[in-house]
Amino acid sequence: ISKNYFEVGIEVKDLYLLQCTSAYPAPQEDAQIGVVRHYYNLSKDIGNVIPGFSSHDIGSTCSMMAIAAGARMIEKHVKLGNVAWSHFDEVAVELGGDKFKDFVSDIRRAEKIVGSEDKVIHDSEHHKY
């Protein structure tokens, strides 16, 4: 997707572009997190583009990496109980128990680890000699 694509004159408030590998489960090596980085760079030129990631992988690793690549939205399937009849049961996060809370905590931790694009000196960097 290039900037030229958006020059057709269609007005939208926000345009969410999510990288998605359409497999259940999607192998982590097929996540293409670099596409999220491309959408992030595109969002710097086109302010209403919101980069994101549609997580069809198992766990939170790819979603955390998407945050590091600039994703501002993560889409993840959720479930209540066993839904083995569905095609996404293996990748869905269970809403009961701690699984969903842990997934969200991982995302929030990734956001903190990424920090901002502004270089700052943290208290942890001040050495006491």
Enumerate the language-model features and the residues they cover.
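Catalytic cores and adjacent flexible loops of soluble metabolic enzymes
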Residues: 1-129
